[in-house]
Structures are given as structure tokens and as C-alpha cells.
Amino acid sequence: MSEQRSDEPEVVDAIIEDQQGAQATTDATPPVRIENSLPTELVIYPLGGRPFFPGMLTPIQVEGSPYYETIKKAMDSHGRLFGILASHAEDGQEVFDANQLFGIGTVVRILEASVNEEAKQIKLLAEGLWRFEVRDVVSVGPPIVAQVTHHNNPVSVVDTDALKPYTMAVINTLKEILKYDSLYQEQVKMFLSRHNFSEPDRLADFVASMTSSSREELQEVLETLPIMARLEKVLTLLKKELEVVKLQNKIQRQVEEGIAEHQRQFFLREQLKEIQKELGITKDDRTAEIDRFRERLEKLTLSEEAEQKIEEELDKLAILETGSSEYGVTRNYVDWLTSLPWGVHSTDKLNIARARRILDRDHDGLEDVKERILEFLAVGKLKGEIGGSIILLVGPPGVGKTSIGRSVATAVGREFYRFSVGGMRDEAEIKGHRRTYVGAMPGKFVQAIKHTKVANPLIMLDEVDKIGASYQGDPASALLEVLDPEQNSEFLDHYMDVRFDLSKVLFICTANQLDTIPRPLLDRMEVIRLSGYITSEKVRIARNHLLPKQLEKNGLDKSQLRVSNGALREIIEGYAREAGVRRLEQKIGAIARKVAVKVLEEAELPISVGQNDLDSYLGKPDFREEKPLTGVGIVTGLAWTALGGATLDIESAQTSTEGNTLLLTGQLGDVMKESARIAFSFLQSNVEKLGGKSERLKGNIHLHVPEGATPKDGPSAGITIATALLSLARTQPLPRRLAMTGEITLTGSVLAVGGVREKVIAARRVGIRELIIPEACRKDYDEVPEHIREGFTVHFVKKYAEVAKLVFG
């Protein structure tokens, strides 16, 4: 309970005396009564906020039209009377609209007034007299004038006796409130100076006006004319006020106790410092470290759990021997706890135009990926935050997954931290080691938070498709908590042993393929695919990004080395035939290093590198323009690997007419072997219908996929294998160069396959312009950018019979 003011007993005694029937003090002013006839019309002043009650004595200041004219007219009226009505307006504004005013208000007398005509300002002291009710509006004004009925009948002595239980209940409740809050005492003193508690009507109005009740509740009291009903309503409001005051008192006491304890500790520490200073005692290492930890805490917004844990550890640190091993463990633990940016967040810069400029500056091509990232940022702008989504960038090596993550961090103004989970086999790398182990440390995510010094960085997890598992745990399972927006707000690192909120962190993961990512982990991510680049895009990337980067890296400038577009195109097609641009950058770097030697040998500048000069800089091309394999039983298929799209030649031959075996070579996986057997069975059943000779598929059949050192798997070569076998059965080569992809069933249906975009890019890279694709993949093909699809003739098929007709007629 808060301390009562020294004059509180005087007020409480006055209340008790009134309860016993004592009259007010001799200097109390009796209620005002106007003896002459009451006016039937009153000037109305609309009052915003709380209603004005009879018995109230309040200063009012009015300024400007129409308030000034209203009060001036009231000052000129008989008895200097006017009426105050509360307003219906939701914002509590004073409105000069009769329809916006309540019907019952208070007659007010002007006791004193000070008029400033130049400023149109009046300061007056107003006294509430009695209630009135509007019968009709004479003038809508302003000022508003209304015909009124006065309610000013005094309460009889008989009524006073009947109301005594109600008045005592009100007085007792008021007395309780005074014990908890002394601010009400001044209002009670002012009331006792003019009235006494033996007037139940005045008591009810006074008590209602001093509560913090709503405008509607107070207006209801004002409109209640029977005094007994009015006292009942006032008692209800007073009981509510008592509960509010008790709660406020409790909260204030708790706050004061907390502040007092904090101040006490502060003063004791300051006194200890002064004593040590006077005695010439310098701080030991332990005291200096504890002070340093406490200085860090002043800048942080700790959770209750963290604050309690840190205080416990600091108290423990203060009593441990500095030479003990436990002291070192505890010191390191407190150092980590106080180094984390509790409650420190950077401000997101969610400017879509700026983000688009940064993405376009850092990356050529990838338009669909940029649009998806901009959509993600736009949603974050509308929501006010961009946490809660986990982005997974999937694509071949070298297409710019990591650099896109950096660009996103720059675009939104967040700190960037990257680490690779490829090959990670220990769960403790994610969730930390328990402090009982020697050399224990927090996991990667806590380290990232400490390194970036903010609680909302952008963290990139590279190579999530290559995460491992061992007897030490499964890191992929540990990632489930981190990458789940519903759980990561209470992430618990084993070392920290205190929950830290990771929900504001923006996570971006990268992978080369989805097949090896655990399904529960993949379900938490939003996949954005990055396909490989076509030659024209690579030339632009090399010109705008890779070449300037390698010039700077090797100490050159553009006045010393010039590389033609023809040379860049030849590098791409002859030396760096890949989905990404990493090997392309390596080749440009090799040229730059050789040019650096020539510059120092004082060669004539600038040194120009054309298409015909590449042999002297890079040696013979790694890839030659090979003639496509042609002949009976040979078909080109389309494949999709972790490195991007690729073309795949399939060869078939009848090795003998004896026996009945299908030999498969070329390091094929189980799924591809099954697909080959299905295609072979389908052809054996339908070869005559498709124009082939069944005897050509009897005996021993050998099916080979070249580049035997490269593992191959998947069902997408089904129709390619079937076509190679049909070519063998018809003894007819393919009449033109085309490529195909699609899974085949025993009934000859052609099913959907994945990686359509990557396969189309692979076909363009080797010059194939006619494709056969499953009808079920039409939507995937339509999503391939227009500049990649340009020049292609594509056939969509549902049945293998359509494939045979397209190929052989």
C-alpha cells in the first residue's frame, strides 16, 4: 500500500463525522436557489468529453466563434444562466448540432467572467445548479436556444431518511478509495467546503463526477432523475473505481519495489568503488570482467529468462576462484550470453525499386527468379516484416545462388552471414555442444547472430542437399526447428541453454537438387529454381561482370586487355560448356594472368584477345563441335542432372539372333534400367504395329549410353530408349536431328518428367531445335522464358504411337 498523505486522517474523520449525521462546517455554502421564476428557454453550450454535473465548480475558457457568441449571449441572459449538454460525437468534440447532443444536461450559472473582445476570448467560472431536459429546439444557431423543463426539486427529509443506507454505502466506498489514492482528497475537501454528505442528490452527483467512468456511464447517471436509482448506479461506478484504484496501487507498489532494489544495488556498487578508490585498491581482473559484462547489459533488451540466467552466472562468477576450471567455463558462458544482440534489430529497407536496381546490377538474366524475390519483398513491405518464409534456391553450380543471397541482403539492408552445411554430420554444429564438454561452443546459428551483431540478419545455408548424418546425430533433423517459423521464436541452443528468438531472421538455403533433401525439411521451404544460362546470357555476364572482376583481381584495367565477343563465345562453347559461369570465370582469369605477364614484358597495349588467339592462352578446346551420332538404333535424349541439363545419346544393337537377353551398359541406375526394360517389353508387344520387324528384337539386344564413367539414372529416357529400339526394329535411322524426353509405360502412355527448362537450355546449347515432350509437361514448357524457347519446334505427345509417327512418319 502506498503511503498516505499527512492530511488524510483529517479528511477521513470528516467523512466519518458526516456518517454519524454531523453537519458540514460553518463556512460551507448552501446550495444555490434562484427564487424568481425560471427561464423557459436556455442558451445551449455543447460540451465535448464528460458530462457537467450539478454542484460542480469549474473554470471554462472559450475562444473564437461560435463559442464566444454562445457565452456572450448567456452572460446577457436572466441570472447569467445557460445549459450544458454533452455531445454524442465519438471523438468527444464540441459540435454545434442539436442532433448530436444528449437530451438532459445541467443548468449552469456564470459566477465570474473575464472578456477579451479583440481575441474573442472569455474565461469564466461556472457552477452547476440543477438538471434540465430539452423539450424543443427554438434556434439551431449557433448559438443553440432550446425550450427546457427544469428538474430542481430538493430532496425531502423523509426521502433523506429512506436514502440513508445508500448514502452510507457510498460514503464507506469513498472512504476505501481515499485509503488507496490520496489524489481524491482535494476533491473531497472542495466538496465539503460547499456541501455536506447529508444531501444525497449532491453526494451522488459529486461521486459520479470524480470517477474515471466512461461518458456514456456518466450521462446515464445524469439522466437518472429518481435519487434512489441514481445512488444505486453511482454505487456501482464507485465499486468499479475502487477495484481500479486497488490494481493501480498494486502495480505502483511493484514498480517502486523494483526500482528501489535496483537503486539500492547501484548505490552499494558506487559506494564500494569509492571505498576501493580511497583505500588505493585497484580492481582485480574478475571485478573488471564483471563490470564489463554489466556494461554490455545496459544496452540490451533481455528476455526475463536470459536476465535471470545472466544474474545467476554473474553471482556465481563473483565467488569462484579465478584459477579454477569452472571459472573459465562460467566466464566464457557469460561472455557469450552478453555478446548476443538481445533486442537489437536492423531496419529493413523494403524499397522495391531499389531492390530491383540492385538485383539487375548484380545479375544478368534470371528474370523469373528476380521477379519471385521482388514478390517476396513486396509481401513483406505490405505486412511490415519479411520474416517467416524460408527460401530455397535450387540450381546447378555456378548460376549465382550465393550471390543472389548477398544481393537480397543488400537490397533489404540486412547483415549477411553464410555457412555451408554440406558434409555436416554432427547435430552439435547446429544446436551447439553442452557446456559439460571441454571446448564446448554454441552452434552455427548463435555464432552467426553474434558475428552480425543484430537479431535479424540474413543467414544463408549453402549446400543443404549435401547434409549428412552419423552416430553423432542428424543435422537435417536439427534444422527442422530452426527453419520452422512456428518454432524458431524459441530456439534453444544446447550451449546457451536460454531461448533466443530467430523468427526475425531471414533464411535463404541453396541446393543443386531436391532429391537428397529430407522431405520434412523441404516442406518448410519455398523453392525457387535457377536454371542454367544460354550462350547469349553468358556472353553478357562475362562482359559486364566476370571480365571487370578478373581485371581488377589481376591488377589490370580495361585499357590493357580487350576480349572480343567472338572470343567470349568460343570460350563458352569450347572451354566452359556448363550450366553456370564458374568455369567461364576461371578461363577468363587464366587469360588475365597471361596478359599480366605480357604487360610486365612491355608488350604493346592494349592486348587484344580474339577467337583465333585462344589456343595460345587456354590451349586446345576441351569441347569440340562433334558431329551428332547417327545411324540405325541411335537417338538423342534429354537429361537433367545436378549440374543442369544435358543431352544423352542412346545406342542399341542386335548382337546375335540367338538367346533372349537385354544387356544394359553405361553405368545406369536402377530406375533407368527398369525404364529400359519397360520400353523393351512395350516394343516387343507392339513392334509390328509401329512398322518394325519383331525378329530384329529377338536374340541378344545391347543398349548402351555413352560416357560410361558418368552415372545416369531416372525414368525420363523411356521414350528415347523405345525410339532407339524401334529404329533398330525398322532398320531405319532418324531422318532428322531431334531430341526427346518422357517416361513410358507398358501400355505406351507418355508420362511427365522434370527439369524441362534445363533440358531445353541443353538442347539449345548443342544446336538442337526440334523436341518431343510429354503433353503433361506443356505447362512447364510454357513457363520457360520466351528468349530461350525462341526458334524451337516442340511436339507434345500423350502416347508413344504419336512419337513413332513424328519420328518415322
Curated annotation (Swiss-Prot):
Domain of life of the source: Bacteria
Induction line: By heat shock.
Enzyme Commission no: 3.4.21.53
CC terms in the record's Gene Ontology section: cytoplasm
GO MF term set: ATP binding; ATP hydrolysis activity; ATP-dependent peptidase activity; sequence-specific DNA binding; serine-type endopeptidase activity
Reaction(s) catalysed (UniProt annotation): Hydrolysis of proteins in presence of ATP
Binding site for ATP: G395, P396, P397, G398, V399, G400, K401, T402
Cleavable signal peptide: none
Residues covered by the Lon proteolytic domain: 629-809
Keyword DNA damage: no
Annotated Lon N-terminal domain residues: 42-242
Matching InterPro entries: AAA+_ATPase (IPR003593), ATPase_AAA_core (IPR003959), Lon_bac (IPR027543), Lon_bac/euk-typ (IPR004815), Lon_lid (IPR054594), Lon_proteolytic (IPR008269), Lon_Prtase (IPR027065), Lon_prtase_N (IPR003111)
Similarity annotation: Belongs to the peptidase S16 family.
Purpose of the protein: ATP-dependent serine protease that mediates the selective degradation of mutant and abnormal proteins as well as certain short-lived regulatory proteins. Required for cellular homeostasis and for survival from DNA damage and developmental changes induced by stress. Degrades polypeptides processively to yield small peptide fragments that are 5 to 10 amino acids long. Binds to DNA in a double-stranded, site-specific manner.
Subunit structure: Homohexamer. Organized in a ring with a central cavity.
UniProt protein name: Lon protease
